[in-house]
């Protein structure tokens, strides 16, 4: 829902039709202009509204009253050399659910690293490392409606974890430009980043 893309009414038509066909709803909105896409997402019960750089205070309140996750994509304004970023602190202070993602695409955000996303969020959106990590894990799971099975380390959930080469979790927000991952655990299988083998946990 953006100028030069779909206007608010077109976005409503598309999302309403998609919802009637059983699709979960997501929208990219308010990246360059506030057309009301975030409030529309909240109204229609979308899983998430993404970008939200220009989202108004009133629309942030609408998100806070809904189950729609506000997803910031800081690599996009970084990649476009923009000065404005998603008002993450306002969103969190309003008690809206807030997540982070890469928006990986070849046009504006060719970045595959969530570690870099966290670093940008700490610098330009003033998140604490703890807030940025939560936004990248359990809150991101909420944004795809899978928080019941992934996103946190809990009994009964899928065993997806990263083992990092840091002595303090806060270094994830402080260090950037290098891969901090030592091992990946996916569905209980352990993958070594260095040598590429895996074993069943």
What are these regions (language model features)?
Residues 1-36, 104:
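Metal-coordinating catalytic core of metallo-dependent amide/deamination hydrolases
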Residues 30, 50-51, 103, 160, ...:
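Acidic active-site catalytic centers that drive phospho-/nucleotidyl reactions
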Residues 3, 53-56, 166, 188:
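Residues that line or immediately flank small-molecule/substrate-binding pockets and catalytic motifs
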Residues 136-138, 158-201:
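C-terminal cap of metal-dependent C-N hydrolases
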Residues 4, 113, 168-169:
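Intrinsic-disorder/low-complexity, polar/charged segments
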Residues 24, 34-149, 176, 190:
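Active-site-adjacent C-terminal substructures of enzyme catalytic domains
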């Amino acid at each position: 829902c953006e100028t030069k893309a779909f206007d608010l009414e077109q976005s409503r038509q598309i999302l309403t039709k998609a919802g009637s066909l059983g699709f979960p709803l997501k929208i990219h909105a308010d990246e360059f202009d506030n057309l009301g896409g975030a409030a529309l997402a909240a109204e229609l019960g979308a899983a998430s509204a993404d970008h939200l750089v220009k989202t108004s205070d009133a629309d942030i309140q609408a998100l806070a009253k809904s189950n729609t996750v506000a997803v910031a994509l800081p690599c996009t304004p970084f990649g476009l050399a923009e000065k404005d970023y998603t008002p993450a602190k306002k969103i969190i202070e309003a008690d809206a659910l807030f997540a982070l993602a890469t928006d990986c695409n070849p046009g504006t955000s060719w970045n595959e690293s969530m570690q870099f996303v966290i670093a940008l969020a700490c610098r330009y959106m003033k998140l604490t490392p703890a807030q940025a990590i939560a936004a990248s894990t359990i809150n991101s799971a909420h944004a795809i409606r899978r928080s019941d099975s992934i996103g946190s380390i809990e009994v009964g959930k899928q065993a997806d974890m990263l083992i990092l080469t840091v002595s303090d979790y806060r270094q994830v927000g402080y260090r950037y430009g290098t891969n901090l991952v030592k091992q990946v655990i996916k569905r209980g299988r352990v993958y070594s980043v260095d040598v590429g083998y895996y074993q069943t946990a």
